[in-house]
């Protein structure tokens, strides 16, 4: 239990209620497929960041709840389509949407979620000045473009073994951090924050998102399958060029590199081959990856500390969430 549990639960429950009311309609199977991943829980980290960022600048809660729901629905849309592209079978401990409902319906479910995200954001922005509405839609739309670019780059990486660290960081700043940045900056924007504070909150989200993805890559090697909610070592099997793989290939001995490369991207790799590869990766890059995540976490806190708002509880809550991001185990 944390000091912030009641605070967080109120936000999560309100956002969940809005999502449930919006992801329903007259075509039951489509809406069932669209709502499927929401039934498995999830951290709701992005709507928490958005709502608390709004609180930080004295924003209206109901408006933030709808904007947070828009962000979470958009995030879920990306998960549905990512699982199709990565051919993943499990997400959050459940069969992925395309596995449970078939590929055509999963694609439609993703499309529906994409549209519903905009519908929710439209509701969130009602009554705001036109300039604020345009800025919010611009941030939201650009985040989708940037995420799509990041996913494409990530897929290209699967066919390369010469990825540099900066290329990886650029990729995750698009694929993952863009939506964190959208969450924190839209939250500040709809609460009336000035341009400099919106920029600082965007920087907070970007750095936090990078730290989050690095930790996610670490957990892909260290968490057990039940905690992770997907098959352990799936990143190795899929050939994902995480920071851990990049650093290992840079530092390991030639015979160790052969072991890693034999398993990397090999859909039929045995459990023993995956474990041997994972052990080598942990040996060379685990500490480095943790330190890198810590660096971006500190960058996020530095940006947060510079905002003009001195609202105590929301500021502390965002710092708590940021720390959770790098200390989490799933």
Swiss-Prot record:
Binds 2 Mg(2+) ions per subunit. GO terms for molecular function: geranylgeranyl diphosphate synthase activity; metal ion binding. It catalyses: isopentenyl diphosphate + (2E,6E)-farnesyl diphosphate = (2E,6E,10E)-geranylgeranyl diphosphate + diphosphate. An all-trans-polyprenyl diphosphate binds at residues 91, 175-176, 213, 230, 240. Its cofactor is Mg(2+). Its EC number is 2.5.1.29. Isopentenyl diphosphate binds at residues 43, 46, 75, 92. The keyword Transferase applies. It comes from the Archaea. The keyword Lyase does not apply. One of its GO terms (biological process) is geranylgeranyl diphosphate biosynthetic process. Mg(2+) 1 binds at residues 82, 86. Mg(2+) 2 binds at residues 82, 86. Keywords: Lipid biosynthesis, Lipid metabolism, Magnesium, Metal-binding, Transferase. Optimum pH is 5.8. CDD domains: Trans_IPPS_HT. Disulfide bonds: none annotated. Pathway: Isoprenoid biosynthesis; geranylgeranyl diphosphate biosynthesis; geranylgeranyl diphosphate from farnesyl diphosphate and isopentenyl diphosphate: step 1/1. It holds the Pfam family polyprenyl_synt. Thermostable. Most of the activity for GGPP synthase remains even after heating at 60 to 70 degrees Celsius for 100 minutes, although 90% of the enzyme activity is lost on incubation at 90 degrees Celsius for 10 minutes. Coiled coil: none annotated. It is an enzyme of class 2 (transferase). Belongs to the FPP/GGPP synthase family. Catalyzes the condensation of isopentenyl pyrophosphate with the allylic pyrophosphates to yield geranylgeranyl diphosphate (GGPP) which is a precursor of the ether-linked lipids. It is able to use dimethylallyl diphosphate (DMAPP), geranyl diphosphate (GPP), and (all-E)-geranyl diphosphate (E-FPP) as an allylic substrate. PANTHER family: GERANYLGERANYL PYROPHOSPHATE SYNTHASE (PTHR12001), SHORT CHAIN ISOPRENYL DIPHOSPHATE SYNTHASE (PTHR12001:SF85). This is Geranylgeranyl diphosphate synthase.
